[in-house]
Amino acid sequence: MMKIYKIILGLSFILATLSIGPGCRQNYVPTDDELADYGWVLFSQGDYVGARDWFQLSIDKDSTYMDGYCGMGWSNGKLGYADTAYQYLHLGKDMTYDDIRFPNQVNLPIEFTAGLVFASSAIGNDSLTIAHSQEFDFKQTQIQVDLGNGSYRWTLKNVLFTSLEYDSKIDAQDVRLAWSMAQYNTSQFAECVSNIRIIRDDADISGVFEPDISTVQGRNEIAKELEKLQLLLSS
């Protein structure tokens, strides 16, 4: 909970600065990461407009601040502006990640890739959804190797949101579901079934899923399973 207090304390200094006249020489100047962190606090509270404003402040202060672009992407996505979300995530994804300045943001690159999966899906571009999903899968595998933990699964802003006692309910399962849907839409039925099985395994769903992908009935089974998984993961 100390992280929350630090963020709120920083906010109080910012507000105090705004109320102090220009004659004061030692106004508090919030750092870009404090601005962005408070944006994520607002995000966790469902205030996506407020979060977006704070993320915008962070990149206005430092146009190279990677997490500010990440927050802008996710906030705009939550507000239903998929095109804008994609633009910010695309702008920020190839920025240089400074793991010395921000050691707690070790998974920041994959946050961008996951966001791009959802933005592409919302836009309705199945090819982009598949491409970004494949990139996400590669990055997650690399993290598993680095951690020596093959069971690792990405969760949005896991460290920060855990400290806030907030469950975003956005994780690797949702990415794989978006990937599966894009595969279904592009008639990649075998690949879709493979991803569905992984989702089922991770969710501890019992039973065998063996639809006949060569038949209309089998493809209908896939569609129904995707609907079930969507309901399950959104609950």
Question: Language model features by range: what are they?
Answer:
Residues 57-58, 91-92, 136, 199:
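Canonical positions in the second alpha-helix
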Residues 65, 99, 109, 140-143, ...:
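Residue-level recognition of tetratricopeptide repeat
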Residues 29-43, 70, 114, 170-177:
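Alpha-helical tetratricopeptide repeat
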